[in-house]
């Protein structure tokens, strides 16, 4: 993010930015780039991956509820139903249609993942209110996330260098998954409604399935078609507005 900011502006921040702008964006970075992942990775470490993945995808639903509070967006009951069906489609895809695969590990893991999901939902909603230019905003939120992660590391763990085998995936993850993707997500948040943004998130498991099946030759289940169709229909309903 620092390199992108430098190439676009030479690390020159908008002179009109005030102290409260910086603090607000650093706070958002703590929510969406640090606390979210800390709670989420704790869940994956301690709990069942299917359980965690399902609870993780509650954040778009939480985002819609928060949008009605902070952004005063009207809760369209039909869109809410469509989003709920989209979530059910995700549930079918993740469990391959077998609900018995869900094993709840314990209340601590569930609350941790739900809290992490809430952090990212709140981050997404409050990001719509930011007046900072998108590249500067991206730099500030990752800087805020770095500060919070460093403090958490100092208080609760110790620093360890990744192995050579782990280094490349970490770099790719940092640049694309937790880097460039944020710019597109923030751009979408400022362009369309909260509900439309939320339903688009449900496309990600469908896209992931395509890559996994194509590149890793994973087994294909009929439930993928059923769940994916539900997600697609729900999404098309929510995105029927012209600006979507």
Language-model features, listed with the residues they occupy:
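Hydrophobic transmembrane alpha-helices of multi-pass small-molecule transport proteins
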Residues: 2, 66, 75-97, 142, ...
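Hydrophobic/aromatic residues within transmembrane alpha-helices
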Residues: 43, 69-75, 130, 137, ...
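Transmembrane alpha-helices of multi-pass small-molecule transport proteins
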Residues: 1-35, 62-63, 118-123, 139-157, ...
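Hydrophobic residues within alpha-helical transmembrane segments
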Residues: 27, 31, 58, 80-84, ...
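Cytoplasmic-side transmembrane-helix entry/capping segments in multi-pass membrane proteins
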Residues: 20-28, 75-87, 132-142
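Juxtamembrane helix-entry segments on the extracytoplasmic side of multipass membrane proteins
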Residues: 17-23, 95-117, 154-172, 219-229
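Helix-helix packing/entry segments at the starts of transmembrane helices
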Residues: 50-58, 127-146, 175-214
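Specific transmembrane alpha-helical segments of multi-pass solute transporters/efflux pumps
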Residues: 9-51, 55-56, 92, 174-192
């Amino acid at each position: 993010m620092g390199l992108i900011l430098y190439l676009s502006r030479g690390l020159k921040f908008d002179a009109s930015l005030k102290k409260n702008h910086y603090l607000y964006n650093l706070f958002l970075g703590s929510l969406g780039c640090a606390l979210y992942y800390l709670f989420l990775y704790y869940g994956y470490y301690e709990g069942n991956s299917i359980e965690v993945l399902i609870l993780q995808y509650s954040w778009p639903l939480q985002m819609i509820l928060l949008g009605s509070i902070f952004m005063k967006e009207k809760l369209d009951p039909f869109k809410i139903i469509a989003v709920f069906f989209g979530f059910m489609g995700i549930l079918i895809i993740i469990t391959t249609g077998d609900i018995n695969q869900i094993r709840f590990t314990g209340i601590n893991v569930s609350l941790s993942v739900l809290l992490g999901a809430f952090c990212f939902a709140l981050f997404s909603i409050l990001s719509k209110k930011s007046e900072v230019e998108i590249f500067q905003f991206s730099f500030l939120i990752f800087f805020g996330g770095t500060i919070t992660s460093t403090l958490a590391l100092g208080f609760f763990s110790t620093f360890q260098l990744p192995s050579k085998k782990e280094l490349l995936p970490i770099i790719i993850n940092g640049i694309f998954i937790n880097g460039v993707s944020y710019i597109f997500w923030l751009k979408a948040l400022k362009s369309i409604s909260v509900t439309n943004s939320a339903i688009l998130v449900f496309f990600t498991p469908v896209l992931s399935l395509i890559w996994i099946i194509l590149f890793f030759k994973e087994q294909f289940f009929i439930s993928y078609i059923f769940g994916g169709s539900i997600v697609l229909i729900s999404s098309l309903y929510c995105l029927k507005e012209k600006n979507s």
